[in-house]
Each structure stands twice: as structure tokens, then as C-alpha cells.
Amino acid sequence: MFKKKSIKYSLAPQTEFYDSLSSSLSWKPFIMFGNFSNIRNTHCNTDSFGLRYNNFNNEKNYNNINNSIFDEKFTSNKEGAVLIGNSAAFGWGSTSDQNTISSLLNEKTKFHFYNLGVSGFSGFQEIIQFLSLQKKLNNIKKLIILSGVNDSFLPYYIKEFDENLGPFFSNSEFLNRMSKASLSLKAKFEKFFYNKVLRKKINWNEMYELDFHNKNSNKNYQFSDYKKKLNPDTSLKFLIDRNLSLWSIIGKGMNIKICYALQPLANWCGKELSIEEKKIFDELDQIDHSRHILSLIDIKKYDLVKNLIIQNCKKYDIKFMDCNESIRKNSHHKEWLFL
């Protein structure tokens, strides 16, 4: 029996490519994951660092493994700038590199924007990304952070994460896989017993920590005695404050102007959906995973996140704009904007 084709793929064929990109991450040290390098596709092209081009041209020497968006030349009347963030900044769903936000900003402003966006990044990963590439960014005058959505729900979506570093996509997979490799022989036997015999799901990161303490402590160690239960509201407030504090330090240290733009969501901007948006969102509502995430980014969460970002942007002297408010003011009702 033939599988029914996705409505999303029928209406926006390019999203099939982007979904395959999202499910096949390029694992990286420190930053956890990123875009694949040297992608050559009708819809998306990346350089040797996995960074997206603004205007890929096959006729140029781009097949070289050392190619970089930082080699792109721009006229003397343009100043260097950076767009960073997650899927919106990267350009998830755009039909081509030329239709990404960074490319359109290049056309409409006096700046040449380097696109450092990566789908799925948390706010802290965005900071690590920028710092890792800082030496390649010469004469940057402006930085736009198009972000906020992932940070708004990750502390509520990821059950176990480092209190200081914060949550990220594939957090649980990372902890469990790293911990499994470090278990003692006894713990590995227990793993086999629980998985194969009792068929119980075990948090192997907790078991690894428990195994260490029981071998090296003078008392019987219970994990619940020491494990701090994280409050997602508290984590969200801390992460937004910490991230904007770091961006402020970066901006002042590099003498660049920073603008934090809260990225838009269909249910946050309050627009009337287009026919295409309704069909795509109705299909997503049938998927448990998508429905769960949508429940974590409702209007109440929008108000909370927006107010926290505004508060901390004022605190750290960072310009703020709300893309949702801009869409509301410009009455994009029934226009097809979201995938």
C-alpha cells in the first residue's frame, strides 16, 4: 500500500529537503551539532564550516573543500554584519539561498550579512557559534540575533539538563550515550537486566553517577539525595538573563551594535492563517511530538518570554524588536508566511 504524501511536501516541496537536513545532524565538539558542510542543493548551499551562502553561484569555484562565506566580496559602500539564530535565521524552508533573511537584508540595507544561523540551536549555542567564528569576522558593525523560540520551550521540553549550561536538542541522547560507554561491569549487567529482562527504560546518566558515588562514598548513595530538581520557569529566566549578558559583553568588546529580534510564530503574531498554513498546521496537529511542542509555545509563553527579553535588553543596553508585533501591525492576514 502506498504511503500518503505529506500535505506540507505537496504545498512546499522544499520542506522535504529541510526535514531530511534536520534529522541528519552533523555532530560537532563543544557546540554539539551544526549544519553539514559543502551542501549543494537547489534550495540550500553551505560552505566548509556548514554556514549558508547568501547567493550561491555554481559558476564560481565553490566546489573547493576550503570554500567559505567569509571569502565573499562586497562593495566598499557596504559594512560587515552578522545574522545569527536558529531555523528562522538559517532560512529553514526557503526555496533558495537568495530567499533567506540574510540575503534579503543584503539587498535592502547598507550591510553585507554573514549568516551564522543553525536550525535547532539554543541561545547559548548561538553564542558559542559566534565566538568560535569571531576571528573570521573582520570589521563587523552590526549583529542581529533572530531567536527566542527554542529557548522559550526547551527548559520545559528537555527533562534533564545542566542547570548552568542549559538544555539543547538531543540533550538526553547525548547524556545516555556518553554514560553507557562509561558504566562499570556491574552497571552494564544491570543495564542488560533492566533493558532486556524487565524492559524498563533507565536513565543511564543517573545510573552512571550513582555507580560512581556508590564505589567512592562511605555511605549508601541515593540519587534523590543530591539531585536538584530544576524549575523550568527559573531556568528560563536565568538563561535569558545570562545569554543577553554575554551578548552585551561581546558587543561592547567588539564595538558592534546588537539588536535582539524575537522570531515570529504563527500563533504569537495573531494573524489569520492562509489556506496553506491551515492545511499544514492541521497535519502537524496529528503528530504527538509537534502537538506537545505547540502546547509549550502558547500565547502565555509568548508574553512571558517577550517580557523577560525586553527586561534584560534594557538591563544590558541591547536594542529589541518583536517580529510578531511587526507582522501584526502590517496586517499580513491570510498571507502565507509560515511552514
Question: Which residues are covered by each model-predicted region?
Answer:
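Residue-level recognition of beta-strand->loop/alpha-helix junctions
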Residues: 115-117, 262, 322-325
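Loop/turn elements at helix/coil->beta-strand transitions in domains of secreted/extracellular proteins
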Residues: 78-79, 110-112, 138-142, 254-259, ...
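Second-shell loop/turn segments in exported
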Residues: 88-95, 115-116, 233-237, 298, ...
